[in-house]
């Protein structure tokens, strides 16, 4: 079951023949992901990694039946690639690209409404359902199959959490790296809601960071949902000064509720088990599941 991805998901790669697309497509195939082809305009009709290359996403979908796309396209073209995937009927679009202009993403996100496509990212590590399918840039060997769902703004903290959860003897259903940009396709709350409705996911790890209101929105949803699945939360950027961007474009304290302390307070008030250090994620999730 899990969420978003399963072992039969058919995946295409946009920007397939480029350096990044080639490297990560190879890693995905080795993990067991059903990569069925890719898109590079002007190279349609050729093959790459023993898979067909198409000029357009529409051609790729009509030939392969793909329902998932991962995008390794330069920032100036990435928003168009997202919209092209949605137009072609792709249901899950994962955009890895960092540095997409904000106005481009505002347009792309609005465009996706009503298309039936879900966007993960941009500027994200992707999505992985353990032992089934990996659509992203994460090191697959860290993710062991289990019963914990992960939603995170941070790629590396996703990997850290997954490693700790595995070492605690638990493992994950799916990990969703939602991305660290100000405008992203799937919010923390929307990802948490997916896990709340997934019968295989028994607990959730929610990793946020300074900037924006997504964590507070998710926390209030968790409080009001009536769902008793335990949630462990962590907020990165606890020492960040106001007005200083910390890595991600969206990780900047602009107002009082953007700080790590404010977010952690709201999360605790909403019943989330908040940890002060990422080193405590694994043992805390093990503890709350055992209760």
Label every model-predicted segment.
Residues 1-291:
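Catalytic-core regions of core metabolic enzymes
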